[in-house]
Amino acid sequence: DDDDLNGLTEWQRPFFVNWGSDAAQRAGTIRSDRREIAWPGLDENGDFLNDHNENGNLLPDYEEPFLRYRSDRPEFLFGLDMNHNGTIDRFENDILPDYPYKKDHSGYNAFVQVEVIPGLKAVGGRQNMRLLSGDGYTRSHYYLVTWVRSLGRGGRLRLAAHGARVKDDIPDDLRQWVQPLDAPGRMVDVRDVLPGLNAWKNDLYADVEQRIGPGVRIFHRLKWHWSQQLETAEEARQREGRKTSFFLGVINKAEWSIPIGLGVLEPRWKSEYRRERPFSTRVSFSESIEQWAILMWTQPLMAESVGVSYFPKYGRQLFSTELQVGIETGRLWLLQGMRAGAERDATSWTGVVQLRNQTAYQGYQIVTRTGGQLQRRNIKGAGSQDASTVFMTVTAGLNR
């Protein structure tokens, strides 16, 4: 069972259990704990770290000041849900062995794919499965249309549309990685509440990346999911569900890199809008807008090292020591309802100073980062929260 494809099984084996108290056995227990952690689809760069928590602290990168600009929440990303349990397939982790097909299942998935023009593909298919040892079944007709187009200046446009008519009463329970705010991440059991028992569902996704002039980049992302149960509203309520559920998320980003002398000034802006009505009645409806403005300054100091031929106005010089200063301000408008981590309107600001030094030592590249961070968050009707952090990290590697 290796759903995250990292070469380590996710089951706990008897010979990894800590039966005693010596150091070797304790180390074995640590390995066993790590084997139970899995985040399929969230390590696309293959570095064995969660792409949404690269620094391994108690905050996902999409919640952390400055890092949040590069990291978008997984619920804004596109993917197919072919087992109709409400979770994108590429993010799923279960406790089942990785057989070519699920045990106790019989059936087929047949589809036809046509490339209409280069970059534009259309798929239509039929899914039919049943349980061998029971009365469960899955039947669906579905379509998928995708379009990828290159834009000028290295830009790219991606569009995807997916829809399905589903009848599915086979539960596909999961064991998923969850990263709460200010708490260690953990694996939790996620029950399939059968949102595709008898339903129509549609997904629409689009993202576009553009370069406008020298040093200016913008990015837009849109995701819309809609599901309509074909049973009555009362029947849906009896199983703690809603007849109509949806998710609408829009992300806009812009950044500008401005060379000033040897330094670089980087203004950034990010906006995140989400409107969500989950299938489960245990989770409330919510609508919110969150925006951040970031200003970063990087100033080279001290010795300079040039790894390639450098000509003025063509390329960037590399400096062994850099001073980085940044400030981020953000605001959350909770328009309707509430969701986890967003119960009230809030404002925040964060300031950081970091000194980065890079040097070579016996064939290794050693990077040292030292700095401090101040943060204040004002929550409407609940006062303010202040936090300060002093940090120092040392990283050694063979690659520059």
Report the location of each language-model feature.
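Acidic, glycine-anchored loop motifs typical of Ca2+
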Residues: 2-96
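Eukaryotic acidic, serine/threonine-rich low-complexity intrinsically disordered regions
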Residues: 122-204, 209-226, 234, 245-246
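Transmembrane beta-strands of outer-membrane beta-barrel proteins
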Residues: 118-124, 153-159, 216-220, 252, ...
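Outer-membrane beta-barrel strand-turn architecture
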Residues: 114-118, 147-153, 165, 198-200, ...
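Outer-membrane beta-barrel "beta-signal"
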Residues: 385-400
